[in-house]
């Protein structure tokens, strides 16, 4: 039971300080992509997150690689920066792909 409690406490810190971690992700985005906007969305923004929730982060850049492999490399750098076990779901998109998200996501918080 102590292990579960430790995991819950560890994840709770990410939710309490999600903006700080999103700023870390943004630092990597700027370094790798030069021009990037970072948004948080989903249950954490809506105040509806649960212990099983993740924190959705959307990185938008006109310099986003087309290759999914290159995007995966950037995502890996971001996760290493915040902690691989961090409960972040990082979405990497170009401005055109961002328009698709805007159709479905009601609320974004720009970092």
Placement of each model-derived feature along the sequence:
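Catalytic core of pol beta-like nucleotidyltransferases
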Residues: 1-39, 45-52, 62-111
């Amino acid at each position: 039971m102590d292990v579960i409690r430790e995991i819950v406490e560890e994840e709770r810190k990410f939710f309490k300080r999600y903006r700080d971690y999103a700023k870390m992700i943004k630092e990597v985005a700027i370094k790798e992509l030069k021009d990037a906007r970072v948004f948080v969305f989903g249950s954490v923004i809506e105040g509806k997150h649960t212990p099983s929730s993740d924190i959705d982060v959307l990185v938008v850049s006109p310099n986003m690689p087309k290759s999914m492999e290159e995007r995966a490399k950037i995502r890996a750098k971001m996760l290493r920066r915040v902690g691989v076990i961090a409960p972040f779901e990082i979405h990497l998109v170009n401005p055109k792909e961002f328009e698709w998200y805007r159709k479905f996501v009601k609320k974004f918080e720009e970092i």
